Amino acid sequence: MRSETQMLPESGSVLADALLKVDANVGFARAVVDGLVGGQVWTAGSEGSAAHHVAHPYGMSLVWGDGVHRVFDEIIAHLREGRYRTREEWLQIDPRWASLPWEEKLTAPGGRSAVSVHRRVNFEFDPNLFRAGRDRIAVPDGWSVVPADASDFARPGSVVPAEFWDNAEDFLKHGGGWREQNDELRGALAFASFRFDDELELGIETHPEARGQGLATAAAAHMIEDLLAQGILPVWSCREGNHASVALATKLGFHPVRTLPYYGLTPPV
């Protein structure tokens, strides 16, 4: 795969237009194609620009395009070889081609990577549901909610701004976030993981010592209010098996609208 930063501007424009046909939350792919973050893009050689694979630095990836079905074997070979893969990859498929035998081919014997099979849930935000439950979401006693700043970029954790943005300046420019804190601890952070047009996908991270207090809910609710005031639509996606994230999304006014194939692929050996 080649770095998105090496692509010609017109190539990125073509890919961005092609992504508009994908009926799924693909902000991570847009972030790479639009040049907001680094990343990798591969195009099937035998079908020109009609079948693509994009990988975000966080590890999320997408196969999409009008010609995926015509070059399915070439795509499978590319994914199974995995020469580009240096960390665990979380692969999503353009819903138009979800019925192709991805699981059968990716998990076939002889591959260089371990493959796990999951489902990813895309949610849709309902402002009426959010407002109906907003009064029940309060900042816990002893905590305060404040806007994120540059120091939050380097926050430790697995779902944190440094995994989604190249630097603190870009993180704050494209959405920033809100954090819950007390005198001793930064308890939770709700932040912009992907920003595209007038939509923003949320990321959430809670400090291990602060879990179970409702901090993530309160931080996310403040961020959603801020987004709505700016005319920005909140977006939420997660693995179906992440029950805490599914429950949090529901509490914040999101409801599931589609469930898609989702594959974990380890680096090749």
Predicted regions and their residues:
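Short amphipathic alpha-helix that is part of the acyltransferase structural core
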Residues: 1-26, 126-168
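Long, contiguous binding/interaction regions
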Residues: 8, 23-24, 127-128, 177, ...
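Acyl-donor-binding surface of acyltransferase catalytic domains
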Residues: 27, 38-154
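Glycine-rich acetyl-CoA-binding "A-motif" of GNAT/NAT acetyltransferases
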Residues: 48-50, 185-188, 244
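Conserved acetyl-CoA-binding loop-helix of GNAT-fold acetyltransferases
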Residues: 69-79, 202, 206, 212-228, ...
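Conserved beta-strand-loop-alpha-helix junction that forms the acyl-donor binding cleft
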Residues: 93-98, 236-246, 263-267
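Conserved active-site alpha-helix within GNAT-family acetyltransferase domains
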Residues: 98-112, 217, 240-258
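A conserved beta-strand-loop-helix scaffold within acyl/acetyltransferase catalytic domains
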Residues: 169-208
